[in-house]
Design a protein with these regions (language model features):
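Beta-turn initiation residues at beta-strand->coil junctions
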Residues: 2-8, 16, 22-28, 44-50, ...
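Aromatic-rich beta-strand edge motifs centered on tyrosine
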Residues: 9-19, 32-41, 56-65, 79-92, ...
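A motif-centric feature for acidic-aromatic and gly/ser/thr-rich catalytic loops and repeats
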Residues: 10, 97-163
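Acidic/polar residues at beta-strand termini and the immediately following turn/coil
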Residues: 25, 37, 71-73, 85, ...
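Short, solvent-exposed loop/turn segments that connect beta-strands within catalytic domains
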Residues: 26-29, 50-55, 73-77, 87-91, ...
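Extracellular/periplasmic catalytic domains that process cell-envelope and extracellular macromolecules
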Residues: 52-53, 60, 86-90, 99-100, ...
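Pocket-edge structural micro-motifs
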Residues: 63, 70-71, 86, 99, ...
């Protein structure tokens, strides 16, 4: 299957459960592989560019909420941890992110879109605006994954991962 995103045209291969297991750029230089566990959660993403693995992440979950990402290229070091609102019935509102040695807090709108990310001093590290269908424009230098509808944004694909599908 071919899809077009703002980062290019991708060939997508699906497994028997209809989950995207690989994305290959039109020129073949970039390959993104995804693995899923028995509950259908994406447990890993590996990005290969020009034959070299550029990133390889493993994800840890509490239920269906991603709570941590591990760098498989760097001794399984923790890349980031996420804290979700425990008062939400489905706990889908992100509250905080620890990335590296830095703490960030999320500002969300009523649709659970991340609108701002604040650093520990209260300065806006990133701000986002969205179209009705999730196309994002952002400001700030912070690169972090939780954006539209409180879901994971894959920067390489410019798609949002909704636990079962990419949109």
């Amino acid at each position: 299957t071919l899809i077009k995103t703002s980062t290019g045209v991708w060939t997508v291969v699906y497994n028997a459960a209809n989950r995207a297991v690989s994305f290959t750029s039109r020129n073949g230089n970039t390959i993104i592989e995804c693995g899923y566990d028995y509950q259908g959660r994406r447990y890993m993403k590996k990005v290969t560019q020009n034959g070299t693995v550029a990133s390889h992440e493993r994800y840890l979950y509490r239920g269906y909420l991603q709570i941590a990402s591990l760098d498989m290229l760097d001794n399984r070091n923790v890349l980031r941890t996420l804290l979700w609102d425990p008062l939400e019935p489905m706990a889908t509102r992100p509250l905080a992110l620890v990335q590296g040695a830095s703490l960030y807090c999320y500002g969300v709108d009523f649709n659970k879109n991340v609108s701002e990310v604040f650093d520990a001093q209260g300065t806006i590290a990133a701000a986002y605006d969205y179209s009705p269908y999730g196309a994002v424009t952002g400001t700030g230098s912070l690169v972090q994954p939780v954006q539209w509808s409180g879901e994971m944004h894959d920067e390489e694909l410019a798609l949002v991962y909704y636990n079962y599908r990419y949109y």
